[in-house]
Amino acid sequence: MTRAGCAVVAFIAFLGFGIDAGAQSQAANMSFFVTSVGSGKGADFGGLEGADKHCQALATAAGAGSRTWHAYLSTQGAQAVNARDRIGNGPWQNAKGVVIAKDVTELHATNNLNKQTAVTEKGE
């Protein structure tokens, strides 16, 4: 992992695939959250696998653990992994039911992440 990408304790988790637009609860449709708590070891999550595991545990505690979650983090080096390639195609919806972005282009082009929309898995 790049140090810059992991310098903050809170990071973003994404569901690895799009959401169903059916009539489900907001928590059931959540496909994006900012982590509510770190690992207790700063930015050391033990690589992407550890960061994904952390996201999965938080999602499970929030009632959304039946799906696969990925941390929005990249690696560097010869076998680099780009964060945007790990999160599926969208759309992404927060725990309050707000659509953050409909696709990867919108996620990276529009500024729809702010204090009101970048909420934790608990909706806080």
Spans of model-derived segments:
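N-terminal secretory signal peptides that target proteins for export/translocation
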Residues: M1-T2
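Bacterial N-terminal signal peptides
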Residues: G5-G16
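Secreted/extracellular ectodomain signature
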Residues: A21-E124
